[in-house]
């Protein structure tokens, strides 16, 4: 397996980590996954801007060979630099969030130690396809982001991310007229494949706060922070 890096430093992932058990007082962890270009980093930035005055939060990004997403967040000053960390997976993006999560767990430990106390950690996956999901040992709940530019067929294609994520975000709704996508069809198909799990249609261009996605994150933090 290729080596992992945390903020550019080689990371030894060849040791065992127990399955995570949630304990009182630890930060809520929300995973954000989805294909390349769907708007994951833009959503992370929007959530940070909206929540940084009410919650103590940090962000952990995953990229294959670079720290591009973390660098973007730092350049835009969505949080202080010490609250943003990056894992370089060195291989398939879903490996580090599902199969061998050690580098992410260790980076989370570092964020917690450097920024006590934290209420929320957002964990962004590297760009992957519709099959990417997070390990339950890494996060509490997960958001999967797709975008309208792929056409209104995307939700009905399903896949683990679209079907089983705790929140499906259909992003870039402002592009629907340009690509001939029917938002009503996308919502209908999402509701059918997701069997009651929530779906949020957003446009960060038209609503930079991320609207329903922001409300969902706030609710998850409230609920999960009370679970001991």
Swiss-Prot record:
InterPro entries reported in the protein's UniProt record: CobW/HypB/UreG_nucleotide-bd, P-loop_NTPase, UreG
UniProt-listed CDD domains: UreG
GO-annotated cellular components: cytoplasm
Keywords: Chaperone, Cytoplasm, GTP-binding, Nickel insertion, Nucleotide-binding
Pfam families for this protein: cobW
GO MF annotations, alphabetized: GTP binding; GTPase activity; nickel cation binding
Binding sites annotated in the UniProt record for GTP: 34-41
Subunit composition and interactions: Homodimer. UreD, UreF and UreG form a complex that acts as a GTP-hydrolysis-dependent molecular chaperone, activating the urease apoprotein by helping to assemble the nickel containing metallocenter of UreC. The UreE protein probably delivers the nickel.
PANTHER family for this protein: UREASE ACCESSORY PROTEIN G
Protein name as it appears in the record: Urease accessory protein UreG
The species this protein was found in: Rhodococcus opacus (strain B4)
